[in-house]
């Protein structure tokens, strides 16, 4: 059975990988990751893919987090970039029906989060107004906005496909019968619904280590 994998951004950026690779920095993870993919391709014939949008997202993330250009180029050179076939790939209509229903529930939850934040902000604003504490009021506004963003994101985005980038990955994995490497619960959920294999990053790395050890006697 061919080893075909589709990599999400989290396949590389998962913080648990530092311990597995025995390094302290993301740059170290990327270098070890690239070496592992190259060796797995040569020894095991494994193939590694990602989509153009994920490749761009991954490169941008790594650059923002001080990963060297050399390490990034090593990694990207080990991964084949391929666009999914969005025109002929078929996905059951029930998936879209469930997604719409889920989003309606999430929108309602998001509205409740916003309403609660407005009420809290009004109470805090009144208290600081009575006390004539302008600085305290401004800090309270900033805190309320931060809380709103976190709770709104939790209510509306966690555990659901909410970007074209994520959707493209699942379609590509479905199209080429690959195993999707991700720690994103929304992506995992869609994979389960349409029968796409998936694996979390730590298990993926350990799986490659094990296969290499069985084939060569060493990693």
Swiss-Prot record:
CDD domains per the UniProt record, alphabetical: PIN_VapC-like
Record Pfam families: PIN_5
Biological process per Gene Ontology, one example term: tRNA 5'-leader removal
Molecular function terms from GO: ribonuclease P activity
Catalytic reaction equation(s): Endonucleolytic cleavage of RNA, removing 5'-extranucleotides from tRNA precursor
Entry keyword Chloroplast: no
Keyword terms of this UniProt record: Endonuclease, Hydrolase, Nuclease, tRNA processing
InterPro entries per UniProt: RNA_free_RNase_P
The enzyme's E.C. designation: 3.1.26.5
Top EC category: hydrolase
Purpose: RNA-free RNase P that catalyzes the removal of the 5'-leader sequence from pre-tRNA to produce the mature 5'-terminus.
Family: Belongs to the HARP family.
Name of the protein this chain belongs to: RNA-free ribonuclease P
């Amino acid at each position: 059975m061919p080893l075909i994998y589709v990599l999400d951004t989290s396949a590389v950026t998962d913080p648990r990988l530092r311990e597995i690779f025995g390094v302290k920095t993301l740059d170290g993870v990327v270098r070890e990751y690239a070496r592992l993919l190259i060796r797995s391709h040569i020894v095991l014939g494994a193939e590694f893919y990602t989509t153009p949008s994920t490749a761009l997202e991954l490169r941008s993330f790594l650059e923002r987090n001080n990963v060297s250009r050399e390490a990034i180029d090593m990694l990207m050179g080990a991964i084949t970039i391929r666009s999914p076939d969005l025109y002929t790939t078929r996905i059951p209509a029930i998936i879209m029906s469930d997604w719409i229903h889920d989003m309606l529930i999430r929108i309602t939850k998001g509205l409740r989060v916003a309403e609660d934040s407005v009420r809290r902000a009004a109470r805090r604003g009144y208290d600081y107004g009575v006390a004539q504490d302008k600085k305290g009021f401004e800090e309270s506004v900033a805190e309320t906005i931060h809380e709103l963003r976190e709770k709104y994101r939790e209510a509306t985005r966690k555990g659901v496909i909410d970007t074209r980038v994520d959707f493209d990955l699942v379609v590509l994995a479905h199209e080429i019968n690959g195993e999707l490497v991700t720690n994103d619960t929304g992506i995992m959920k869609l994979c389960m619904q349409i029968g796409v294999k998936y694996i979390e990053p730590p298990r993926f790395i350990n799986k490659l280590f094990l296969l290499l050890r069985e084939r060569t006697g060493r990693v």
